[in-house]
């Protein structure tokens, strides 16, 4: 399976290396698809020929606007995920879009005593799990399952 990641940077506060983001996302998606635990992915499409994810980095104002519009929350957030799970006749799969506010990620990293990239890895894993159908706001058990998967992913990303 080929994985394509589109990265768009629409903010200028925090410098984000697109190549590193692409590499991390590919590792996360590959781990989730190649793991022996087939319950990890809620996607019913098995072995798509080509998988696409879009990642857009935005500033505080745009994130607040999107959070208000799509979640009814008038505040800045770190990440929003918009799953598509559209399977094209060609066998390609567009998982969806992840919108990230790097400034918020940076402040959370400081708060949790992590590096920017450690926190961004957690945010990327979280967003990809949302694209795969997980939702921590549905129930406590779903939230626990999602946190456990995030930890598995992060353990796999360590050098």
Curated annotation (Swiss-Prot):
The lineage of its organism: Bacteria, Pseudomonadati, Nitrospirota, Thermodesulfovibrionia, Thermodesulfovibrionales. GO terms for cellular component: cytoplasm. Its EC number is 3.1.-.-. The keyword Protease does not apply. It comes from the Bacteria. It is an enzyme of class 3 (hydrolase). The keyword Coiled coil does not apply. Zn(2+) binds at residues 126, 130, 136. It is found in: Cytoplasm. HAMAP family: Endoribonucl_YbeY. GO terms for biological process: rRNA processing. Keywords: Cytoplasm, Endonuclease, Hydrolase, Metal-binding, Nuclease, Ribosome biogenesis, rRNA processing, Zinc. Binds 1 zinc ion. Belongs to the endoribonuclease YbeY family. GO terms for molecular function: metalloendopeptidase activity; RNA endonuclease activity; zinc ion binding. Single strand-specific metallo-endoribonuclease involved in late-stage 70S ribosome quality control and in maturation of the 3' terminus of the 16S rRNA. This is Endoribonuclease YbeY. Its cofactor is Zn(2+). It holds the Pfam family YbeY.
């Amino acid at each position: 399976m080929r994985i394509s990641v589109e990265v768009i940077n629409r903010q200028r506060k925090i410098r984000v290396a697109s190549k590193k983001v692409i590499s991390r996302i590919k590792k996360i998606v590959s781990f989730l698809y190649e793991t022996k635990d087939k319950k990890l992915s809620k996607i019913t499409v098995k072995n798509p020929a080509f998988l696409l994810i879009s990642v857009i980095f935005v500033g505080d104002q745009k994130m607040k606007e999107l959070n208000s519009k799509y979640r009814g929350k008038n505040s800045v957030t770190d990440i929003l995920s918009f799953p598509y799970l559209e399977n094209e006749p060609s066998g390609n799969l567009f998982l969806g879009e992840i919108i990230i506010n790097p400034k918020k990620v940076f402040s959370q990293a400081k708060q949790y005593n992590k590096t920017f990239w450690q926190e961004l890895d957690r945010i990327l894993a979280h967003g990809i799990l949302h694209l795969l159908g997980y939702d921590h706001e549905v129930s406590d058990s779903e939230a626990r399952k999602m946190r456990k998967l995030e930890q598995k992913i992060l353990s796999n990303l360590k050098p």
